[in-house]
Curated annotation (Swiss-Prot):
Keyword terms: Cobalamin biosynthesis, Lyase, Methyltransferase, Multifunctional enzyme, NAD, Oxidoreductase, Phosphoprotein, Porphyrin biosynthesis, S-adenosyl-L-methionine, Transferase
InterPro entries to which the protein is assigned, alphabetical: 4pyrrol_Mease, 4pyrrol_Methylase_sf, 4pyrrole_Mease_sub1, 4pyrrole_Mease_sub2, CobA/CysG_C, NAD(P)-bd_dom_sf, Siro_Cobalamin_biosynth, Sirohaem_synt_dimer_dom_sf
Annotated active site: 248 (proton acceptor), 270 (proton donor)
Record HAMAP family: Siroheme_synth
Reactions it catalyzes: uroporphyrinogen III + 2 S-adenosyl-L-methionine = precorrin-2 + 2 S-adenosyl-L-homocysteine + H(+); precorrin-2 + NAD(+) = sirohydrochlorin + NADH + 2 H(+); siroheme + 2 H(+) = sirohydrochlorin + Fe(2+)
Protein name: Siroheme synthase
PROSITE patterns named among the record's database cross-references: SUMT_1, SUMT_2
Pfam families hit by this protein: CysG_dimeriser, NAD_binding_7, Sirohm_synth_M, TP_methylase
The organism of origin for this protein: Edwardsiella ictaluri (strain 93-146)
Binding positions (S-adenosyl-L-methionine): 225, 301-303, 306, 331-332, 382, 411
Family: In the N-terminal section; belongs to the precorrin-2 dehydrogenase / sirohydrochlorin ferrochelatase family. In the C-terminal section; belongs to the precorrin methyltransferase family.
Amino acid sequence: MDYFPIFCQLRTKPCLLVGGGEVAERKARLLMEAGAILTVNAGRFTPQFEQWQRDGQLTLIAGDFDPALLTGKWLAIAATDDSRVNQQVLAQSEARCIFCNVVDAAQQTGFIMPSIVDRSPLMVAVSSGGSAPVLARILREKLEALLPQHLGQVAHMAGHLRQRVKAHFPTLSLRRRFWERLFAQDRLAQSLANGDTTQAQQQVDALFSAAPMDRGEVTLVGAGPGDAGLLTLKGLQQIQQADVIIYDRLVSDEVMSLVRRDATRIFVGKHAGHHCVPQEEINQTLLDHAREGKRVVRLKGGDPFIFGRGGEELEALAAAGIAFSVVPGITAASGCSAYSGIPLTHRDHAQSVRLVTGHTRQDGQLDWSCLAAAGQTLVFYMGLSQAATIQQRLLQHGMLPDTPIALVENGTTIRQRVVSGTLTQLETLATRVASPSLIIVGDVVTLRPRLNWFRCEAASA
């Protein structure tokens, strides 16, 4: 973060603007809209500045910049066409610990002014840190079209309701749910937009009288294979509404950065063959937080119903009578194969695909004869530590030694690595990658050189 975003309360605060041209005019409008007591210093002023002074909206001081003008000021803006003067204003301001903005000089300024979308009291600010002001402007224009004008009225009503909500709902979680319901009311916003405050008040009163919102619930959310862009829209909504996030090690840092900032985060990561947190303890953690009336998200890498123990956790919730729902995710097989240029099925190479876990509760549960059959693609999850066994069993049951294979490490992320070779090399290649990795076995791997589009580190045996 190059710049710390902050909104300043400037109402009745003395501020200095140095510059009297059209650019300075735009800054003056913003400062006056914010309620600042504005002094403007310049050699010449546009007619608009002179009109503002006649109207008593600001004070004009003609002449060269005098550092004494900064005395008692909270904020300064240098908006002249003379860079020497602008830098003098900046230096004198910083010497007095006064924030100073130099217009159109992102690298030589004390603070920058973002593009804004004004739906007062709701304000949206967009900034590129001076690197791409046109991009910031384009984003502001998109937001202007997206955010209706009456949002400000909704925000005003919310401000008047704060004390009533605090008195009515005893916990932060309940208050948050009330606000989410309120802001989801399209009819309320429409009533305010139409000026029908009576109807709007009736809709608000109905929310206070609605069914209790203190029942806890758990949502099982698939976080996808790593790339945060592959998280579903519904999954994003759930993690941004949750009171508690219980997540494992396969959830990427990029996805976790999207979680609501004030949500409680509980890590229950597990490694193959070593359960950092026993499954029974994870189940109990879900139950405990849901029973406290919280909105809990169990966030799992990939899809929770594909080798994610999602079914086991939901059985525990169902037995306890806890409400739950499931948001599927893109499983690792789909994500890693797509980002590696390896289609899992292809009319010329594979008419079916099998998703197989490299770890089972008992040896021998897998039908290796079926797995070794031609015309299919095998995808092994959590198979690195069992690579030697996988290689041995497939060869024993008739799979050709030169069957192409690929190991995908950290699939779909910028850290993705793909190591390829043949079945006889699987045990050796497995030592060259780290978990989390996926093993893909089948003729479709030969398509990778032509179909790979995601550029990352790759290696061939």
